[in-house]
């Protein structure tokens, strides 16, 4: 039922389906947390925002990668998803994650704060994609990177050409692309 409506409207994955986000797709490895983290080129001490973090599938390994001197902001509009992420962080003894119940585009993030921003199968759920990408551009430091991961099995799938056009319109430059036509990660850079 959710999938039917999600294809027609910008509806986020409901909290009760959070377990589904955790499953590894047998047809592709590009959307696996370890692969996404590998393509982020993270270092200790970096600051990262995970936009639409969901149940924390990528948030937790990112927090481990940036270490205790780094910071991760887990941003989601659903309190239930943030609660799931918080429970995983507590179980992993991670204290470098800040939880923010908000949508991107609401101007709740600080200007030039982040080294990396993530949109993992979430761009299609955002009603005003241009405003969202503008805010992400604004909160990234010069030279910072936005990483967009999409998989065709997601009802909100965004084609690479669509993401390139939207991101280019707000000032991002393509850095590198990984994957195929059914699943990809597009890394975009904010010019220095």
PLM segments and residue spans:
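Conserved alpha-helix/loop element of class I SAM-dependent methyltransferases that forms part
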Residues: 27-46
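A short glycine-rich, Lys/Arg-flanked "PGG" loop and its adjoining helix->strand segment in the class I
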Residues: 130-142
């Amino acid at each position: 039922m959710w999938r039917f409506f999600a294809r027609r409207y910008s509806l986020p994955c409901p909290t009760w389906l959070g377990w589904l986000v955790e499953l590894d797709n047998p047809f592709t490895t590009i959307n696996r947390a370890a692969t996404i983290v590998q393509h982020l080129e993270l270092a200790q001490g970096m600051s990262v925002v995970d936009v639409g973090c969901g149940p924390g599938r990528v948030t937790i390994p990112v927090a481990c990668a940036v270490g205790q001197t780094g910071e991760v902001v887990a941003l989601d509009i659903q309190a239930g998803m943030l609660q799931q992420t918080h429970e995983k962080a507590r179980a992993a003894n991670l204290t470098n994650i800040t939880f923010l119940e908000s949508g991107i585009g609401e101007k709740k993030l600080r200007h030039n704060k982040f080294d990396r921003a993530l949109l993992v199968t979430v761009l299609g759920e955002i009603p005003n994609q241009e405003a969202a990408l503008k805010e992400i551009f604004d909160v990234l430091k010069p030279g910072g990177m936005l990483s967009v991961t999409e998989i065709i099995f997601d009802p909100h799938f965004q084609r690479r050409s669509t993401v390139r056009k939207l991101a280019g319109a707000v000032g991002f430059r393509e850095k590198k692309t990984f994957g195929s036509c059914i699943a990809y990660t597009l890394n975009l850079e904010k010019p220095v």
